Structure formats: structure tokens, C-alpha cells
């Protein structure tokens, strides 16, 4: 049996560019892609915290150190500059792989900079 699990997440990444007349995709700072373990051209799910839009696209590598999050092509209608996004990548894992599974989570601060990383999401309390 295989399970589809959260592989990586950029939590509350801030859109720096929204380019309608681009081929498509989402450009993400190369440093953040590496930290999260997201590959260039890998499918990603994007959840817009500000307007509730949810869509699928693929990641492309942005200039390292640029702090770019650019939503491109038709997806530019779903996220504008300044919007906060949750960007997720999922993967299939075997039962054996699940024994040591931990996602890569990058938490972004209000200033658009990386705040901290984690391999777990905190338990939600009532």
C-alpha cells in the first residue's frame, strides 16, 4: 500500500510578482526550493490565504536569494502581489518509507522572509 503525504510546504509565502503574460507556473526562490526539497517542474498545490483560491501548477526555480514568489500565467488571476500563499508538494510513500517520513515545512514571516523550518506541523488544540 502507498499513501500520499505532504512532502513539503511553504507556509504563508508572500507573492512578490503576479505575471499574467508568462507561460505559467510559480517561480520560487531557489534557496527555498532546495530547503523544502521541491524540484523544478514538480507539481505544486497553492492555497491563497487571502481569497480562498486553490489551484495546481508547477514550480520553477527563481533566482537564489531573490525571495521571489511569482504566480504566472492564468494563475495570476488567482493570486496578486502581497497575497499570502500556502504552497504544498505531495508525494507517494510506501509503508516502509512512512516509518521515517517527515515533511519539510518552511514558515515565512510577515516580512516575506524565512522565519524558521520544521519537520512537523504543531498539534491543533481546541
From Swiss-Prot:
Cofactor mode of binding and number, as noted: Binds 1 pyruvoyl group covalently per subunit.
Catalytic activity: L-aspartate + H(+) = beta-alanine + CO2
Active site: 25, 58
SUPFAM superfamilies xrefs: ADC-like
Binding-site list for substrate: 57, 73-75
Keyword set, alphabetical order: Autocatalytic cleavage, Cytoplasm, Decarboxylase, Lyase, Pantothenate biosynthesis, Pyruvate, Schiff base, Zymogen
Processing after translation: Is synthesized initially as an inactive proenzyme, which is activated by self-cleavage at a specific serine bond to produce a beta-subunit with a hydroxyl group at its C-terminus and an alpha-subunit with a pyruvoyl group at its N-terminus.
Pathway: Cofactor biosynthesis; (R)-pantothenate biosynthesis; beta-alanine from L-aspartate: step 1/1
Gene3D superfamilies given in the database record: 2.40.40.20
Cofactor dependence: pyruvate
Assembly and interaction partners: Heterooctamer of four alpha and four beta subunits.
Role of this protein: Catalyzes the pyruvoyl-dependent decarboxylation of aspartate to produce beta-alanine.
Family the UniProt entry places it in: Belongs to the PanD family.
Protein name: Aspartate 1-decarboxylase
Amino acid at each position: 500500500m502507498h499513501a500520499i503525504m505532504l512532502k513539503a510546504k511553504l507556509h504563508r509565502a508572500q507573492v512578490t510578482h503576479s505575471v499574467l503574460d508568462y507561460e505559467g507556473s510559480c517561480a520560487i526562490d531557489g534557496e527555498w526550493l532546495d530547503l523544502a526539497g521541491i524540484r523544478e517542474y514538480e507539481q505544486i498545490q497553492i492555497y491563497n490565504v487571502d481569497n480562498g483560491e486553490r489551484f495546481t501548477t508547477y514550480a520553477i526555480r527563481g533566482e537564489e536569494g531573490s525571495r521571489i514568489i511569482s504566480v504566472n500565467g492564468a494563475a495570476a488571476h488567482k493570486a496578486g502581489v502581497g497575497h499570502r500563499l500556502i504552497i504544498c508538494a505531495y508525494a507517494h510513500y510506501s509503508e516502509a518509507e512512512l516509518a521515517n517520513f517527515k515533511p519539510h515545512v518552511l514558515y515565512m514571516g510577515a516580512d516575506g522572509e524565512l522565519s524558521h523550518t520544521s519537520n512537523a506541523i504543531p498539534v491543533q488544540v481546541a
